[in-house]
Structure formats: structure tokens, C-alpha cells
């Protein structure tokens, strides 16, 4: 039997042609320390900052400290099964979360995994949680209003699309209520909302989700929650994950509102991680880069240039103060990063002025350019009037006799405070806000007793809906104040037939 060498060589060639290289080079390290949501590993010399690393039990971590001898890793999720000596390997990917339309209406955790029991989220799009903020030339000036539906904000501290407006105040002063009401008011406004709950009790988040469902707001909202029972890394990455979800829509030319509730808890979790990773502590034991932690997050909110699609992301970060101290480290940091702040005072809140906005300490640095023209006209001096009223009110407590002009100022001030009060979850459309503020600033409310102001307002809105819907439509469509003679005539017609509580009581008797 003779073996033909040609056949053998052709067979070998065929085999070589069909050969597939299944070898994959992996960089694997060894865990040297594990505990408190932190791991240290050696042997990962080429790991990138914020790279996703996988442990042998399937858990993931993120490289946060890149040191000479080892890597400091924050563990995302359960770390009970990880032991010293376990293997950890590089994935070559930066930490990413799922994004896209499929996320809308869902409640997810910091990794984008659903926690609402409604099954898997069908999306194949992802975005890195850390992303470079748009540069100067990629942005555009804030020019479109973002209506919150709250008279006190839309009149005194207006917000524009693409702005960063801080909501700051002590605990239990209505910070979350303002954020939720703003989300509720975005219905039919072509906005997508992202609510990031950081360190909020699960029962509280459940209540917020139920509120959003009740008013139909979950149709355009993503809720991201990192509860207090979760490890610190989950709380730390939550706002960045939320920003990534919002950016997906912004870079596709859509408008996004994102609420970070609240960044004080995120700062605390980052301080915890930094101390565990042996980073040198600074003021109030926060690490040296705590300012950068918040600035790189909030700079991602922007109004993009027309070249990039003209989308926007408006950020409402929330900060909790201790005993009204806005000069503490984190509050001053975030105040200096944002384009203004809404300061809520507990004294006002307990006195029944809700939303409890301190007009003197609250400011919007860029929102005035975006304010509706009609609102600008009727609310132009409102902030100054309110601030001077507060001063006068303090002065009159000494019991001195007042001249007629001062008395008139006080009366107008008290009515202003009453008009700016608003029940929770009842946002008002801008045209109705303009009507009541016009009535206030033009003296139509001066003869009305304070206890009847709310009823006067509600009945005035009903009157306009029935008899002057064209004026409301004009404000809504054009943003301009209609003919003042027509407006005055309608308000006078209503005020002439309005009966005060005393008149109603007398009529009954």
C-alpha cells in the first residue's frame, strides 16, 4: 500500500485552512482583601479607571483605585460569596447601563436591572455611566421654559430647559414634593423624566411611584432607585446611571428632566467608599475630589446646539441641609455648580406656606431668559415685593403705628403669600398662573379677605374656563399677555359677582 504524499499535504492544507484559533488572553488577578463592599486585587496591572471587573462567583465590580501594587474595587451587588484568593478578571469594558425607550415606565436599580416585577427590559442599547459633558461650542443658551406648574417657582425662580436648579432645604420641607409636582406637570409637554432616588426608603419610593402612576406620569418617566439597604457603591453610581439614561434621549434631540433625590446621600456614600479605599480625607472627612464628583455629573445637563439636535437635559439636584445651614461643605459646593437654587425654609413650611420657598435666598441665574413673556410682565417685581414685605412684617412686630402706604404694602404682601400657596400634586398650567398673578399685581385681590383668596382663585379659573377660554388659549399659544382691557373687564365681571364668606354667612341668616 503506497501513501501518496500529495494527498497527505493537501489534507494537511485543508486542516490548516479550517483551523480556528479559540485561544483568548485574559488578564486575571487575585483578591487579597474583601469587606464592606470593597475588594483589593493584585495582578491587574492594565486595568482602566471605572473598568468593569468580574469575580469568579459571577459578581461584578468597578475599578476605582489604581495603585502601584493593587487595584481598589467597589463591588456592585452582593459580596458575601467572594473570598480572599478568589480570581477576578478584566472585562475590557467601562461600566455601562441599558438605555432606550424600553426603560420608560419602569423602576430599575443602579445597574439598570428591573425591580418592579414586570419582567425583563427588552433593549440592546447601552451607554457608559461616565460620559464627557458637552463642550462650550456644543451648547446653546437656555431659551425654552420648563414649566413646573408651581406659581412660586414659575414666577419667582423660573427654570429653563437645560438648566441645573438646586432644590435645597432641611428634611421634611417639601423638596421631593416640588420635584414630583414638576414631573407631573410635564404631561403633554414632550418631556421624558428620570427620577433618581438615592438612599430613599423603599416604602417612600413605592409611594412616589404610586403617585406617578395615579396621575399618568409613569408613561414618560424612568424611576431609578438605590435604597439605604444596598451597598454604598450602588448609591454612588446611581446618579451617573440616571444621567446616562437621560443622555440617550438628549442626544437624540429630545427634552429630558432628571431629578437627583438626593445628592447629600450620594456624597455620604462616596465618602464611605473613599475612606474604605484609604483615600486621604479632607474637610468634613470628604475626599479631595468630592467637588468634581458632583460637577462632572451636573455638567452633563445641557441645552445642546442645533447641530447636535437641539435636545436638552434639565437637572434638579436635591440637597438636604442641617438646621438650615447652607454654608456647609456639600451645599456650598453644589450651589456653586448649579445655575440657581430654590431654598426651602422649615419655618415657612410649619407656618403653612407651602411650597415653603424663601424668596430672598432663592435665585435662578439663567431661567429669566426662558420665562414666558406674559409671566415676565405680571411677575416682574413680585420677588422684590415679597422680600420687602418680609422685612416690613418683621418691623411691624414692634407694634409701631403704620401709615396708609405701608399698610397697603403689608396687605398686598399677605395676599401675595396666600396666592403663591399651592396644594401638593396640583400643578397649574401657565395661563392660569398668569391670570391670578395679573389679578394680584393689578389690585383686584386687595379688597378680598385673606381667608377667601383660595376660593376666589378657584372660582376665577372656573369663570375663565367658561367665559374667557379664548384669553387663556391666547396666553398658552403665544406666551404673550392678551389685551389688558379685555382681561380687566373679565376679572371685574367676576369680582363684581364674588361673595365673601361674611356675605355668604349673612345671606344664610
Swiss-Prot record:
Keywords: ATP synthesis, ATP-binding, Cell membrane, CF(1), Hydrogen ion transport, Ion transport, Membrane, Nucleotide-binding, Translocase, Transport. ATP binds at residues 169-176. It catalyses: ATP + H2O + 4 H(+)(in) = ADP + phosphate + 5 H(+)(out). GO terms for molecular function: ADP binding; ATP binding; proton-transporting ATP synthase activity, rotational mechanism. Pfam families: ATP-synt_ab, ATP-synt_ab_C, ATP-synt_ab_N. SUPFAM superfamilies: C-terminal domain of alpha and beta subunits of F1 ATP synthase, N-terminal domain of alpha and beta subunits of F1 ATP synthase, P-loop containing nucleoside triphosphate hydrolases. It is a peripheral membrane protein. Signal peptide: none annotated. GO terms for cellular component: plasma membrane; proton-transporting ATP synthase complex. It comes from the Bacteria. PROSITE patterns: ATPASE_ALPHA_BETA. PANTHER family: ATP SYNTHASE SUBUNIT ALPHA, MITOCHONDRIAL. Produces ATP from ADP in the presence of a proton gradient across the membrane. The alpha chain is a regulatory subunit. This is ATP synthase subunit alpha. It comes from Lacticaseibacillus paracasei (strain ATCC 334 / BCRC 17002 / CCUG 31169 / CIP 107868 / KCTC 3260 / NRRL B-441).
Amino acid at each position: 500500500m503506497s501513501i501518496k504524499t500529495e494527498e497527505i499535504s493537501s489534507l494537511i492544507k485543508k486542516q490548516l485552512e479550517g483551523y480556528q484559533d479559540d485561544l483568548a488572553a485574559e488578564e486575571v488577578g487575585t483578591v487579597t482583601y474583601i469587606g464592606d463592599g470593597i475588594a483589593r486585587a493584585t495582578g491587574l496591572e492594565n486595568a482602566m479607571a471605572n473598568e468593569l471587573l468580574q469575580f469568579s462567583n459571577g459578581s461584578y465590580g468597578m475599578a476605582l483605585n489604581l495603585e502601584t501594587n493593587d487595584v481598589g474595587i467597589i463591588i456592585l451587588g452582593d459580596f458575601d460569596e467572594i473570598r480572599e484568593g478568589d480570581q477576578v478578571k478584566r472585562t475590557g469594558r467601562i461600566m455601562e447601563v441599558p438605555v432606550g425607550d424600553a426603560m420608560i415606565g419602569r423602576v430599575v436599580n443602579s445597574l439598570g436591572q428591573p425591580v418592579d416585577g414586570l419582567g425583563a427590559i427588552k433593549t440592546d442599547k447601552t451607554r457608559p455611566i461616565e460620559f464627557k459633558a458637552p463642550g462650550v461650542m456644543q451648547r446653546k443658551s437656555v431659551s425654552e421654559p420648563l414649566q413646573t406648574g408651581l406659581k412660586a417657582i414659575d414666577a419667582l425662580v423660573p427654570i429653563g430647559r437645560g438648566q441645573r436648579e438646586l432644590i435645597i432645604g432641611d428634611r421634611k420641607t417639601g423638596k421631593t414634593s416640588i420635584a414630583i409636582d414638576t414631573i407631573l406637570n410635564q404631561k403633554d409637554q414632550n418631556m421624558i423624566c428620570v427620577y433618581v432616588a438615592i438612599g430613599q426608603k423603599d416604602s417612600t419610593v413605592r409611594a412616589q411611584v404610586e403617585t406617578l402612576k395615579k396621575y399618568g406620569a409613569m408613561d414618560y418617566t424612568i424611576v431609578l432607585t438605590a435604597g439605604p439597604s444596598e451597598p454604598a457603591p450602588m448609591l454612588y453610581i446611581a446618579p451617573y446611571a440616571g444621567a446616562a439614561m437621560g443622555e440617550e434621549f438628549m442626544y437624540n434631540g429630545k427634552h429630558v428632566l432628571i431629578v437627583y433625590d438626593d445628592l447629600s446621600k450620594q456624597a455620604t456614600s462616596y465618602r464611605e467608599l473613599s475612606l474604605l479605599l484609604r483615600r486621604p480625607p479632607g474637610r468634613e472627612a470628604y475626599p479631595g475630589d468630592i467637588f468634581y464628583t458632583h460637577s462632572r455629573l451636573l455638567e452633563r445637563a445641557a441645552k445642546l446646539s442645533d447641530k447636535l439636535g437641539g435636545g436638552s437635559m434639565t437637572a434638579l439636584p436635591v440637597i438636604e441641609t442641617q438646621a438650615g445651614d447652607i454654608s456647609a461643605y456639600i451645599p456650598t459646593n453644589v450651589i456653586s455648580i448649579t445655575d440657581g437654587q430654590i431654598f426651602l425654609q422649615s419655618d415657612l413650611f410649619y407656618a403653612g406656606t407651602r411650597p415653603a420657598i424663601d424668596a430672598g435666598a432663592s435665585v435662578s441665574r439663567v431661567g429669566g431668559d426662558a420665562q414666558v413673556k406674559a409671566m415676565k410682565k405680571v411677575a416682574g417685581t413680585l420677588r422684590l415685593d415679597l422680600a420687602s414685605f418680609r422685612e416690613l412684617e418683621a418691623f411691624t412686630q414692634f407694634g409701631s403705628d403704620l401709615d396708609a402706604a405701608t399698610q397697603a404694602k403689608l396687605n398686598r404682601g399677605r395676599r401675595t403669600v396666600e396666592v403663591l400657596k399651592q396644594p401638593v400634586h396640583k400643578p397649574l398650567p401657565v395661563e392660569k398662573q398668569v391670570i391670578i398673578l395679573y389679578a394680584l399685581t393689578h389690585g383686584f385681590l386687595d379688597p378680598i379677605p385673606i381667608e377667601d383668596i383660595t376660593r376666589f382663585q378657584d372660582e376665577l379659573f372656573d369663570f375663565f374656563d367658561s367665559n374667557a377660554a379664548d384669553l387663556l388659549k391666547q396666553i398658552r399659544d403665544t406666551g404673550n399677555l392678551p389685551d389688558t382691557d379685555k382681561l380687566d373687564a373679565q376679572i371685574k365681571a367676576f369680582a363684581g359677582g364674588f361673595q365673601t364668606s361674611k356675605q355668604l354667612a349673612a345671606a344664610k341668616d
